[in-house]
Amino acid sequence: MIPMLYHNVLPEAEEYVKSVEAGKFEDIQTESGMFKKIQQRGEDALYSLVSHFMPEYEIVMNFVRKSPLGQKEPNFIHTDEMHGDKTLIYYLNQTYPEGYGTTIYDNNDIPILIHRAQFNSLFMFDSGYKHSRNIEENFGEGEDARMVQVMFLKAKSNE
């Protein structure tokens, strides 16, 4: 799959972000390690949209991650293949530091695609692709901390 980018994803994105910010963020242990400061989202507006446009996939994880400046993460360059077939990243911050976004790498960890984040945009790619956020140390504090919604999708079987 060629990575895909969508802009203006949700019609009322500002209200959506307010609902996210009103929720609780917590650390959750998963089979691949500790997910810090996440909020599980369940069947929210983005879930409904993705389910409608990608009915051949099941959404197996749907969460928002808040990552303030200096928050240590277990991995920088990594894959998500243990979680699903597709990774979706929805950008929730109104503004970003220069150059922030997501980078996809080749097998030698050489950047081959650099995406610059924009509010209310969604970046989708195969979960087996090596990738990272563009700023390793994260950014912001409080309401200005890095905030992305992540979904992992698995292809439904044709049985």
Predicted regions located by residue number:
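Non-heme Fe(II)/2-oxoglutarate
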Residues: 1-75
